[in-house]
Protein backbone atom coordinates (compact mmCIF):
# COMPACT_ATOMS: atom_id res chain seq x y z
CA UNK A 1 0.00 0.00 0.00
CA UNK A 2 1.64 3.22 -1.18
CA UNK A 3 1.50 6.16 1.21
CA UNK A 4 1.97 9.90 0.83
CA UNK A 5 2.88 12.34 3.62
CA UNK A 6 0.97 15.57 4.14
CA UNK A 7 0.50 18.21 6.78
CA UNK A 8 -3.03 19.16 7.75
CA UNK A 9 -3.06 22.95 7.76
CA UNK A 10 -5.32 25.65 9.14
CA UNK A 11 -4.32 28.58 6.97
CA UNK A 12 -0.53 28.62 7.57
CA UNK A 13 -0.55 26.75 10.90
CA UNK A 14 0.34 23.05 11.03
CA UNK A 15 -2.43 21.07 12.72
CA UNK A 16 -1.26 17.45 12.29
CA UNK A 17 0.90 15.18 10.15
CA UNK A 18 -1.00 12.74 7.94
CA UNK A 19 -0.20 9.58 6.03
CA UNK A 20 -2.68 9.16 3.19
CA UNK A 21 -3.32 6.11 1.05
CA UNK A 22 -2.01 7.02 -2.40
CA UNK A 23 -4.89 5.28 -4.17
CA UNK A 24 -7.99 5.83 -2.03
CA UNK A 25 -7.02 9.15 -0.43
CA UNK A 26 -8.06 7.85 2.99
CA UNK A 27 -6.16 8.83 6.14
CA UNK A 28 -3.97 5.95 7.34
CA UNK A 29 -2.10 7.59 10.20
CA UNK A 30 -2.40 10.79 12.22
CA UNK A 31 0.40 12.39 14.23
CA UNK A 32 -0.96 15.31 16.29
CA UNK A 33 0.83 18.63 15.95
CA UNK A 34 1.70 21.31 18.48
CA UNK A 35 -1.64 23.10 18.07
CA UNK A 36 -4.40 20.62 19.02
CA UNK A 37 -6.86 23.50 19.45
CA UNK A 38 -6.67 24.00 15.67
CA UNK A 39 -7.98 20.52 14.87
CA UNK A 40 -11.28 20.59 12.98
CA UNK A 41 -14.05 20.46 15.57
CA UNK A 42 -15.53 17.37 13.96
CA UNK A 43 -12.14 15.63 14.00
CA UNK A 44 -10.87 16.65 17.41
CA UNK A 45 -11.72 13.48 19.33
CA UNK A 46 -8.82 11.30 18.18
CA UNK A 47 -7.50 9.83 14.95
CA UNK A 48 -10.70 7.96 14.12
CA UNK A 49 -12.80 11.12 14.39
CA UNK A 50 -10.37 12.92 12.04
CA UNK A 51 -10.68 10.08 9.51
CA UNK A 52 -14.47 10.40 9.64
CA UNK A 53 -14.23 14.18 9.28
CA UNK A 54 -12.02 13.77 6.18
CA UNK A 55 -14.43 11.26 4.67
CA UNK A 56 -17.40 13.60 5.32
CA UNK A 57 -15.42 16.45 3.76
CA UNK A 58 -15.23 14.66 0.41
CA UNK A 59 -18.00 15.39 -2.09
CA UNK A 60 -20.69 12.65 -2.05
CA UNK A 61 -20.38 10.38 -5.06
CA UNK A 62 -24.17 10.70 -5.43
CA UNK A 63 -23.90 14.42 -6.17
CA UNK A 64 -24.77 15.48 -9.70
CA UNK A 65 -22.12 14.36 -12.21
CA UNK A 66 -19.40 13.45 -9.70
CA UNK A 67 -19.46 9.71 -10.46
CA UNK A 68 -19.11 10.41 -14.20
CA UNK A 69 -16.29 12.88 -13.52
CA UNK A 70 -14.34 10.34 -11.47
CA UNK A 71 -14.71 7.72 -14.19
CA UNK A 72 -13.76 10.16 -16.92
CA UNK A 73 -10.63 11.34 -15.08
CA UNK A 74 -9.66 7.90 -13.78
CA UNK A 75 -9.91 9.01 -10.15
CA UNK A 76 -10.65 6.03 -7.86
CA UNK A 77 -12.64 7.77 -5.10
CA UNK A 78 -14.04 11.05 -3.84
CA UNK A 79 -11.31 11.15 -1.18
CA UNK A 80 -8.72 10.89 -3.97
CA UNK A 81 -10.41 13.84 -5.66
CA UNK A 82 -10.18 15.70 -2.36
CA UNK A 83 -6.43 14.99 -2.12
CA UNK A 84 -5.84 16.19 -5.69
CA UNK A 85 -7.42 19.48 -4.65
CA UNK A 86 -5.50 19.70 -1.35
CA UNK A 87 -8.71 19.27 0.64
CA UNK A 88 -9.58 22.90 -0.06
CA UNK A 89 -13.05 24.25 0.59
CA UNK A 90 -15.02 27.47 0.30
CA UNK A 91 -16.51 26.79 3.74
CA UNK A 92 -13.41 26.88 5.95
CA UNK A 93 -9.63 27.32 6.04
CA UNK A 94 -8.39 23.74 6.29
CA UNK A 95 -6.20 22.17 3.61
CA UNK A 96 -3.41 19.62 3.22
CA UNK A 97 0.14 20.46 2.19
CA UNK A 98 2.46 17.83 0.69
CA UNK A 99 5.54 17.28 2.84
CA UNK A 100 8.39 19.44 1.60
CA UNK A 101 6.10 21.80 -0.29
CA UNK A 102 6.60 25.55 0.04
CA UNK A 103 2.95 26.33 -0.68
CA UNK A 104 1.26 28.87 1.59
CA UNK A 105 -2.37 29.70 2.31
CA UNK A 106 -2.00 32.78 0.12
CA UNK A 107 -1.02 30.51 -2.77
CA UNK A 108 -3.95 28.13 -2.49
CA UNK A 109 -6.89 29.88 -0.79
CA UNK A 110 -10.02 29.56 -2.89
CA UNK A 111 -11.31 32.76 -1.29
CA UNK A 112 -8.63 34.83 -3.02
CA UNK A 113 -7.38 32.73 -5.97
CA UNK A 114 -9.22 31.94 -9.18
CA UNK A 115 -10.43 28.40 -9.79
CA UNK A 116 -12.11 26.48 -12.55
CA UNK A 117 -14.85 24.07 -11.71
CA UNK A 118 -14.67 20.78 -13.66
CA UNK A 119 -18.47 20.44 -13.83
CA UNK A 120 -19.07 22.40 -16.99
CA UNK A 121 -22.39 20.69 -17.74
CA UNK A 122 -24.41 23.25 -15.79
CA UNK A 123 -24.25 26.82 -17.08
CA UNK A 124 -26.31 29.92 -16.38
CA UNK A 125 -27.38 33.07 -18.08
CA UNK A 126 -25.74 35.93 -16.18
CA UNK A 127 -28.26 38.67 -15.38
CA UNK A 128 -26.38 39.56 -12.20
CA UNK A 129 -22.86 39.80 -13.63
CA UNK A 130 -20.47 37.68 -15.63
CA UNK A 131 -18.68 34.67 -14.25
CA UNK A 132 -14.97 35.29 -14.41
CA UNK A 133 -12.47 33.08 -16.17
CA UNK A 134 -8.72 32.97 -15.93
CA UNK A 135 -5.95 31.77 -18.20
CA UNK A 136 -3.81 31.27 -15.11
CA UNK A 137 -6.18 29.13 -13.11
CA UNK A 138 -4.70 26.78 -10.50
CA UNK A 139 -5.63 23.11 -10.59
CA UNK A 140 -7.55 23.29 -7.32
CA UNK A 141 -11.33 23.06 -7.39
CA UNK A 142 -13.88 23.63 -4.62
CA UNK A 143 -16.05 20.86 -6.10
CA UNK A 144 -14.05 18.19 -4.29
CA UNK A 145 -15.45 19.31 -0.92
CA UNK A 146 -18.92 20.48 -1.95
CA UNK A 147 -21.62 18.76 0.09
CA UNK A 148 -25.13 17.56 -0.81
CA UNK A 149 -26.66 15.38 -3.52
CA UNK A 150 -28.02 18.03 -5.90
CA UNK A 151 -25.90 19.09 -8.87
CA UNK A 152 -24.13 22.32 -7.92
CA UNK A 153 -20.97 24.28 -8.58
CA UNK A 154 -19.01 27.28 -7.36
CA UNK A 155 -18.64 30.34 -9.57
CA UNK A 156 -16.87 33.66 -9.28
CA UNK A 157 -19.35 36.38 -10.26
CA UNK A 158 -18.04 39.95 -10.19
CA UNK A 159 -15.25 38.80 -7.83
CA UNK A 160 -17.79 37.24 -5.44
CA UNK A 161 -17.80 33.50 -4.67
CA UNK A 162 -21.27 32.21 -5.50
CA UNK A 163 -22.90 28.80 -5.32
CA UNK A 164 -25.10 27.70 -8.23
CA UNK A 165 -27.58 24.91 -7.51
CA UNK A 166 -29.62 22.79 -9.88
CA UNK A 167 -32.44 20.35 -9.27
CA UNK A 168 -33.19 16.67 -9.03
CA UNK A 169 -35.47 15.62 -11.85
CA UNK A 170 -36.96 17.49 -14.77
CA UNK A 171 -38.35 20.62 -13.11
CA UNK A 172 -37.15 23.60 -11.12
CA UNK A 173 -39.10 23.19 -7.90
CA UNK A 174 -36.19 22.59 -5.53
CA UNK A 175 -34.37 25.72 -6.69
CA UNK A 176 -37.55 27.79 -6.62
CA UNK A 177 -38.18 26.47 -3.10
CA UNK A 178 -34.89 28.10 -2.06
CA UNK A 179 -36.13 31.38 -3.54
CA UNK A 180 -39.44 30.93 -1.71
CA UNK A 181 -37.65 30.39 1.60
CA UNK A 182 -35.70 33.61 1.03
CA UNK A 183 -38.99 35.41 0.37
CA UNK A 184 -40.49 34.02 3.58
CA UNK A 185 -37.56 35.10 5.76
CA UNK A 186 -37.50 38.56 4.21
CA UNK A 187 -41.23 39.02 4.83
CA UNK A 188 -40.69 37.89 8.44
CA UNK A 189 -37.92 40.47 8.89
CA UNK A 190 -35.44 37.69 9.73
CA UNK A 191 -32.06 38.82 8.44
CA UNK A 192 -29.91 35.76 9.14
CA UNK A 193 -30.68 33.78 6.01
CA UNK A 194 -29.06 33.13 2.64
CA UNK A 195 -30.53 35.20 -0.18
CA UNK A 196 -31.22 32.95 -3.18
CA UNK A 197 -31.93 34.36 -6.62
CA UNK A 198 -33.52 32.39 -9.49
CA UNK A 199 -31.32 31.95 -12.57
CA UNK A 200 -32.05 30.35 -15.92
CA UNK A 201 -29.96 27.23 -16.52
CA UNK A 202 -28.73 26.53 -20.03
CA UNK A 203 -27.08 23.55 -21.66
CA UNK A 204 -29.31 20.91 -20.08
CA UNK A 205 -31.75 18.65 -21.88
CA UNK A 206 -34.67 20.72 -20.59
CA UNK A 207 -34.41 24.38 -19.66
CA UNK A 208 -34.83 24.88 -15.95
CA UNK A 209 -34.35 27.48 -13.28
CA UNK A 210 -31.57 27.02 -10.79
CA UNK A 211 -30.74 29.32 -7.91
CA UNK A 212 -27.61 31.20 -6.93
CA UNK A 213 -26.37 32.67 -3.66
CA UNK A 214 -23.23 34.26 -2.27
CA UNK A 215 -20.82 32.30 -0.09
CA UNK A 216 -21.35 33.15 3.59
CA UNK A 217 -17.86 31.98 4.60
CA UNK A 218 -14.87 34.22 3.95
CA UNK A 219 -11.17 34.74 4.64
CA UNK A 220 -12.08 35.50 8.26
CA UNK A 221 -15.21 33.42 8.91
CA UNK A 222 -15.54 29.63 8.70
CA UNK A 223 -18.73 27.61 8.49
CA UNK A 224 -18.82 24.78 11.03
CA UNK A 225 -21.73 22.39 10.36
CA UNK A 226 -23.82 21.24 13.30
CA UNK A 227 -22.55 17.66 12.91
CA UNK A 228 -19.02 18.87 13.68
CA UNK A 229 -20.24 20.94 16.63
CA UNK A 230 -22.06 17.92 18.06
CA UNK A 231 -19.10 15.58 17.48
CA UNK A 232 -16.58 17.93 19.11
CA UNK A 233 -17.54 16.90 22.65
CA UNK A 234 -18.71 13.62 24.13
CA UNK A 235 -22.46 13.69 24.70
CA UNK A 236 -24.01 12.40 27.91
CA UNK A 237 -26.54 9.67 27.11
CA UNK A 238 -29.14 11.52 29.18
CA UNK A 239 -28.81 14.66 27.03
CA UNK A 240 -30.54 15.03 23.67
CA UNK A 241 -28.56 15.94 20.56
CA UNK A 242 -30.58 19.18 20.43
CA UNK A 243 -29.54 20.24 23.94
CA UNK A 244 -25.98 19.03 23.37
CA UNK A 245 -25.67 21.25 20.30
CA UNK A 246 -26.85 24.26 22.31
CA UNK A 247 -24.43 23.43 25.13
CA UNK A 248 -21.40 23.25 22.82
CA UNK A 249 -22.38 26.51 21.11
CA UNK A 250 -22.56 28.32 24.44
CA UNK A 251 -19.18 26.86 25.46
CA UNK A 252 -17.71 28.49 22.34
CA UNK A 253 -19.08 31.96 22.96
CA UNK A 254 -22.70 32.10 21.76
CA UNK A 255 -25.54 32.95 24.12
CA UNK A 256 -28.11 30.26 24.85
CA UNK A 257 -30.90 32.70 23.95
CA UNK A 258 -29.37 33.39 20.53
CA UNK A 259 -29.02 29.69 19.71
CA UNK A 260 -32.47 28.68 20.95
CA UNK A 261 -34.15 31.61 19.22
CA UNK A 262 -32.52 30.69 15.92
CA UNK A 263 -33.32 26.98 16.17
CA UNK A 264 -36.94 27.59 17.16
CA UNK A 265 -37.49 30.05 14.32
CA UNK A 266 -35.92 27.53 11.92
CA UNK A 267 -38.16 24.73 13.20
CA UNK A 268 -41.31 26.85 12.79
CA UNK A 269 -40.49 28.06 9.29
CA UNK A 270 -39.33 24.60 8.19
CA UNK A 271 -42.69 23.29 9.41
CA UNK A 272 -44.79 25.68 7.34
CA UNK A 273 -42.58 25.06 4.28
CA UNK A 274 -42.58 21.29 4.92
CA UNK A 275 -38.79 21.21 4.74
CA UNK A 276 -38.04 17.58 5.55
CA UNK A 277 -34.24 17.67 5.29
CA UNK A 278 -32.83 19.85 8.09
CA UNK A 279 -30.09 17.36 8.98
CA UNK A 280 -26.93 18.28 10.88
CA UNK A 281 -25.00 19.31 7.76
CA UNK A 282 -27.73 21.77 6.75
CA UNK A 283 -27.19 24.33 9.50
CA UNK A 284 -24.37 25.34 11.81
CA UNK A 285 -22.30 28.22 13.11
CA UNK A 286 -19.82 30.79 11.84
CA UNK A 287 -16.42 30.80 13.56
CA UNK A 288 -13.73 33.46 13.68
CA UNK A 289 -10.75 31.65 12.16
CA UNK A 290 -8.27 33.69 14.22
CA UNK A 291 -9.80 33.49 17.72
CA UNK A 292 -11.67 30.19 17.04
CA UNK A 293 -14.69 31.67 18.85
CA UNK A 294 -18.16 31.15 17.45
CA UNK A 295 -19.42 34.47 16.08
CA UNK A 296 -23.07 33.68 15.32
CA UNK A 297 -25.36 31.05 13.90
CA UNK A 298 -24.77 30.51 10.19
CA UNK A 299 -27.56 31.92 8.01
CA UNK A 300 -30.45 29.60 7.17
CA UNK A 301 -29.74 27.81 3.90
CA UNK A 302 -30.66 24.67 1.96
CA UNK A 303 -34.46 24.62 2.07
CA UNK A 304 -34.93 23.02 -1.36
CA UNK A 305 -36.42 19.75 -0.13
CA UNK A 306 -39.65 21.43 0.93
CA UNK A 307 -43.17 22.21 -0.29
CA UNK A 308 -44.08 18.56 -0.94
CA UNK A 309 -41.30 18.46 -3.54
CA UNK A 310 -41.48 14.66 -3.87
CA UNK A 311 -44.83 13.28 -5.03
CA UNK A 312 -45.31 10.70 -2.21
CA UNK A 313 -45.46 13.64 0.24
CA UNK A 314 -48.31 15.42 -1.54
CA UNK A 315 -50.96 16.29 1.07
CA UNK A 316 -53.57 13.86 -0.25
CA UNK A 317 -50.97 11.06 -0.08
CA UNK A 318 -49.63 11.70 3.41
CA UNK A 319 -50.79 12.75 6.86
CA UNK A 320 -49.90 16.43 7.15
CA UNK A 321 -49.61 16.12 10.93
CA UNK A 322 -47.08 13.27 10.92
CA UNK A 323 -44.61 14.07 8.14
CA UNK A 324 -41.25 12.44 8.79
CA UNK A 325 -38.08 14.53 8.75
CA UNK A 326 -34.32 14.12 8.83
CA UNK A 327 -33.52 16.29 11.84
CA UNK A 328 -33.33 16.34 15.65
CA UNK A 329 -36.62 14.42 15.83
CA UNK A 330 -38.32 11.92 13.55
CA UNK A 331 -41.46 13.94 12.75
CA UNK A 332 -42.40 17.58 12.32
CA UNK A 333 -44.80 17.52 15.26
CA UNK A 334 -42.08 16.15 17.53
CA UNK A 335 -39.83 19.01 16.41
CA UNK A 336 -42.55 21.53 17.28
CA UNK A 337 -42.44 20.30 20.87
CA UNK A 338 -38.92 21.77 21.12
CA UNK A 339 -40.30 25.28 20.56
CA UNK A 340 -40.69 27.34 23.75
CA UNK A 341 -41.61 30.70 22.18
CA UNK A 342 -44.44 30.40 19.68
CA UNK A 343 -44.29 34.10 18.78
CA UNK A 344 -41.12 33.79 16.71
CA UNK A 345 -43.07 33.59 13.43
CA UNK A 346 -45.70 36.13 12.36
CA UNK A 347 -48.56 34.30 10.67
CA UNK A 348 -49.81 37.43 8.88
CA UNK A 349 -46.41 37.88 7.19
CA UNK A 350 -46.16 34.42 5.63
CA UNK A 351 -46.17 34.32 1.79
CA UNK A 352 -49.62 34.00 0.26
CA UNK A 353 -50.88 31.38 -2.18
CA UNK A 354 -50.80 33.79 -5.14
CA UNK A 355 -47.20 34.84 -4.44
CA UNK A 356 -46.06 31.23 -4.46
CA UNK A 357 -48.10 30.39 -7.56
CA UNK A 358 -46.45 33.30 -9.38
CA UNK A 359 -43.01 32.01 -8.40
CA UNK A 360 -43.75 28.43 -9.54
CA UNK A 361 -45.17 29.78 -12.81
CA UNK A 362 -41.58 30.38 -13.94
CA UNK A 363 -41.50 26.65 -14.77
CA UNK A 364 -44.72 25.23 -16.18
CA UNK A 365 -43.36 21.68 -15.87
CA UNK A 366 -43.80 21.71 -12.07
CA UNK A 367 -46.62 19.23 -11.47
CA UNK A 368 -49.36 19.25 -8.83
CA UNK A 369 -49.04 23.00 -8.14
CA UNK A 370 -52.63 23.25 -6.85
CA UNK A 371 -52.05 20.31 -4.50
CA UNK A 372 -48.77 21.81 -3.29
CA UNK A 373 -50.44 25.15 -2.56
CA UNK A 374 -53.35 23.47 -0.79
CA UNK A 375 -50.85 21.54 1.31
CA UNK A 376 -49.07 24.80 2.19
CA UNK A 377 -52.36 26.35 3.29
CA UNK A 378 -53.09 23.30 5.44
CA UNK A 379 -49.68 23.67 7.07
CA UNK A 380 -50.42 27.34 7.82
CA UNK A 381 -53.63 26.30 9.58
CA UNK A 382 -51.77 23.64 11.56
CA UNK A 383 -49.12 26.16 12.56
CA UNK A 384 -51.75 28.71 13.59
CA UNK A 385 -53.38 26.06 15.77
CA UNK A 386 -49.99 25.39 17.37
CA UNK A 387 -49.45 29.12 17.93
CA UNK A 388 -52.81 29.41 19.70
CA UNK A 389 -52.95 26.14 21.64
CA UNK A 390 -49.29 25.36 22.28
CA UNK A 391 -49.69 21.79 21.06
CA UNK A 392 -49.50 20.43 17.51
CA UNK A 393 -52.93 19.86 15.98
CA UNK A 394 -53.95 16.23 15.82
CA UNK A 395 -55.39 14.30 12.90
CA UNK A 396 -59.14 14.57 13.07
CA UNK A 397 -59.16 18.09 14.49
CA UNK A 398 -61.59 19.65 12.02
CA UNK A 399 -59.77 22.95 11.77
CA UNK A 400 -56.50 21.32 10.72
CA UNK A 401 -57.82 19.92 7.46
CA UNK A 402 -59.40 22.71 5.45
CA UNK A 403 -57.65 26.06 5.00
CA UNK A 404 -59.66 29.24 5.43
CA UNK A 405 -61.26 30.47 2.22
Regions found by a protein language model. Name each.
Residues 1-268, 272, 286-405:
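Phosphate/dinucleotide-binding and metal-coordinating scaffold of catalytic cores
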Amino acid sequence: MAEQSYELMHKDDVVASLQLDDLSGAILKVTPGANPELLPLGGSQGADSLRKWWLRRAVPISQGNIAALLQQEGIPSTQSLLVRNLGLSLSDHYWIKPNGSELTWKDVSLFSNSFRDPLESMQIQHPHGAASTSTQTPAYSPSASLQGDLIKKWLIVDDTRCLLKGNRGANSQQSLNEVLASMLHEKQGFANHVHYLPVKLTGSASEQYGCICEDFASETLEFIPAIDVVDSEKKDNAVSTYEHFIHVCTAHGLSELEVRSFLEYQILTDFVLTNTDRHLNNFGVLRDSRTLNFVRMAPIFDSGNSMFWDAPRLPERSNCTEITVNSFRKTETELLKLVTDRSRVHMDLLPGRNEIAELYAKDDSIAFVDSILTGYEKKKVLLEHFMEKGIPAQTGHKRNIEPER
